[in-house]
């Protein structure tokens, strides 16, 4: 056992790696070294077996505990079992992994799924565009969406009226077929959807002429969607039970309406906070004064402090977007005050500025005073 590599080293994970990290590492190695991906490559086959052996131990809590305590010696007894290292492989979890990677070749996970039982219908996703103002106040939109409904002629069976689907003879109505095959890891028991009935367990000899054997009829429907105030760009409104119909008596899926918000020319949004720029005159910046500020709720008055510098940011508490979960809770509105420096002056204005310049002391003229109104 001295030449056997450390299992953590084989998978490239630290000794304190959690189950998710171990599984992720094994998936990557399994995909890289699987013999079907490397036909005739003996080295790849060896590495694949090595990774599979390591995963079989480290993915099992009890085996991992024994390995952490005794190393490879924990499995020296009883060598020659079905799996490498003297213990049996449990292909339940590996079947899920291989099924994800190689289309169900190894099965195992399928044994835990009843493909012929009730299944929830698929969700349907559509987009709806609204204005920025509508996102602030909430709105109602009507959207057209194509949905499937049970065929009224065959009542969802897919069979011609007066006939019924027959039980699939290949799978006995189970929707899955089971087979055992010899692999480089030993005998592997696999399950796959039945190729004859495609996992339904039923065979339709005479198809319904209205739905062509699908059991469903597609039609366009108009659905009213209530979009709450405060919704953000890309968020979805979920309408339960308005998606695709379920299978074998399962519930319908949901309709997911993704909201696309047109950009505002005046405001920017970050979460529930609103940002905008407000231009103020040079005299207002120097002397202070009341200005009007446009918010998502309309204009409000704000008192500019004397000596305000350009770029000063001001917070208007509670003037931002409403919370989509509680309209009474709101974000804030942050305004950045931009001082407008005039570039074209008439003679009277120039004379006034020249008089102001002459009235400044030496320190003020060279910018050494702390403030315009400091003493």
From Swiss-Prot:
Each CXXCXGXG motif repeat, start to end: 151-158, 168-175, 194-201, 208-215
Domain J residue range list: 6-71
Record InterPro entries: DnaJ (IPR012724), DnaJ_C (IPR002939), DnaJ_domain (IPR001623), DnaJ_domain_CS (IPR018253), HSP40/DnaJ_pept-bd (IPR008971), HSP_DnaJ_Cys-rich_dom (IPR001305), HSP_DnaJ_Cys-rich_dom_sf (IPR036410), J_dom_sf (IPR036869)
Subcellular location: Cytoplasm
Residues binding Zn(2+) 1: 151, 154, 208, 211
CC terms in the record's Gene Ontology section: cytoplasm
Gene3D superfamilies membership: 6.20.20.10, DnaJ domain (1.10.287.110), Urease metallochaperone UreE, N-terminal domain (2.60.260.20)
UniProtKB keywords: Chaperone, Cytoplasm, DNA replication, Metal-binding, Repeat, Stress response, Zinc, Zinc-finger
Cofactor note: Binds 2 Zn(2+) ions per monomer.
Assembly description: Homodimer.
Similarity comment text for this entry: Belongs to the DnaJ family.
Cited PANTHER family: DNAJ HOMOLOG 1, MITOCHONDRIAL-RELATED
Protein function: Participates actively in the response to hyperosmotic and heat shock by preventing the aggregation of stress-denatured proteins and by disaggregating proteins, also in an autonomous, DnaK-independent fashion. Unfolded proteins bind initially to DnaJ; upon interaction with the DnaJ-bound protein, DnaK hydrolyzes its bound ATP, resulting in the formation of a stable complex. GrpE releases ADP from DnaK; ATP binding to DnaK triggers the release of the substrate protein, thus completing the reaction cycle.
Protein name from the UniProt record: Chaperone protein DnaJ
Organism encoding this protein: Lachnospira eligens (strain ATCC 27750 / DSM 3376 / VPI C15-48 / C15-B4)
């Amino acid at each position: 056992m001295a030449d056997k590599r450390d299992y953590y080293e084989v998978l490239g994970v630290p000794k304190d790696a959690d189950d998710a990290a171990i599984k992720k590492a094994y998936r990557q190695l399994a995909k890289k070294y699987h013999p079907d991906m490397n036909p005739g490559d003996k080295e790849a086959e060896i590495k694949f077996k090595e990774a599979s052996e390591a995963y079989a131990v480290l993915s099992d809590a009890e085996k991992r505990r024994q390995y952490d305590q005794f190393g490879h010696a924990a499995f020296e007894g009883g060598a020659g079992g079905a799996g490498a290292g003297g213990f049996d492989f449990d292909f339940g979890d590996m079947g899920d992994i291989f099924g994800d990677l190689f289309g169900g070749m190894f099965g195992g996970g399928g044994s835990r799924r009843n493909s012929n039982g009730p299944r929830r219908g698929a969700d349907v996703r559509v987009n709806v565009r609204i204005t920025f103002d509508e996102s602030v106040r909430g709105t109602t939109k009507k959207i057209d969406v194509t949905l499937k409904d049970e065929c009224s002629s065959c009542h969802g069976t897919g069979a011609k009226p007066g006939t019924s689907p027959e039980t699939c003879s290949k799978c006995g109505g189970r929707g899955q077929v089971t087979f055992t095959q010899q692999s480089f890891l030993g005998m592997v028991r696999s399950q796959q959807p039945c190729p004859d009935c495609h996992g339904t367990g039923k065979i339709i000899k005479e198809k319904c002429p209205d739905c062509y054997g699908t059991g469903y009829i597609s039609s366009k429907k108009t659905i009213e969607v209530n979009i709450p105030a405060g919704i953000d760009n890309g968020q979805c409104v979920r309408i339960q039970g308005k998606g695709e119909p379920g299978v074998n008596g399962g519930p319908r899926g949901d309709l997911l309406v993704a909201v696309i918000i047109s950009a505002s020319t005046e405001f920017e949004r970050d979460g529930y906070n609103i940002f905008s720029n407000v231009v103020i005159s040079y005299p207002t910046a120097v002397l202070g004064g009341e200005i009007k500020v446009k918010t998502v709720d309309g204009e409000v008055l704000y008192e500019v402090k004397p000596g305000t510098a350009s770029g000063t940011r001001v917070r208007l508490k509670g003037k931002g977007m409403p919370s989509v979960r509680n309209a009474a809770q709101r974000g804030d509105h942050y305004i950045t005050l931009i001082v407008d420096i005039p570039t074209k002056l008439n003679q009277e204005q120039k004379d006034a500025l020249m008089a102001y310049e002459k009235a400044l002391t030496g320190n003020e003229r060279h910018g050494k005073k702390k403030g315009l109104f400091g003493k």
